Amino acid sequence: MQKIRSIKKNWEFQAIINKKNQIVTNYLIFYYVKSDFFEIGISVPKKFANAVKRNYYKRQIKNALYILWKKGEIFLNFRVVLIARKNFLPLSFETKYQKLAKIFKELKRNEK
């Protein structure tokens, strides 16, 4: 199984966001662009928490994505930017996992 690639550069984030293909929920903003491989960038806005907590939330999201990846629910060829909203942060890990799974199901439905 391949490793999940990550988006790191600001211009890569902006290129995906400027395409304006998005799924918006109460918990996440999810921008996506078709690609030859799966790649994801995670952003937690600076005003929501200090750096330690932002990194903690990013690790939780990455872990949930890794579980989805291992279960085979993420096999799409998209570049994705995931922006967490404030009410997503205090949720339990299981709830975060379910919200991410729901978004990827919607993305799969939008692909067709």
From Swiss-Prot:
Q: Which cellular component terms (GO) are annotated to the entry?
A: ribonuclease P complex
**Physiological role:** RNaseP catalyzes the removal of the 5'-leader sequence from pre-tRNA to produce the mature 5'-terminus. It can also cleave other RNA substrates such as 4.5S RNA. The protein component plays an auxiliary but essential role in vivo by binding to the 5'-leader sequence and broadening the substrate specificity of the ribozyme.
Q: Which UniProt keywords apply?
A: Endonuclease, Hydrolase, Nuclease, RNA-binding, tRNA processing
Q: What is this protein called?
A: Ribonuclease P protein component
Q: What family is it from?
A: Belongs to the RnpA family.
Signal peptide span: none
Which HAMAP family would you find in this protein's record?
RNase_P
Q: Which NCBIfam families match?
A: rnpA
Q: Does the keyword Hydrolase apply?
A: yes
Q: Which Pfam families match?
A: Ribonuclease_P (PF00825)
BP terms from Gene Ontology: tRNA 5'-leader removal
Q: Please describe the quaternary structure of this protein.
A: Consists of a catalytic RNA component (M1 or rnpB) and a protein subunit.
Catalytic activity field? Endonucleolytic cleavage of RNA, removing 5'-extranucleotides from tRNA precursor
Q: Which GO terms describe its molecular function?
A: 3'-tRNA processing endoribonuclease activity; ribonuclease P activity; tRNA binding
Asked if Nuclease is a keyword of the record, the answer is yes
Which EC number applies?
Answer: 3.1.26.5
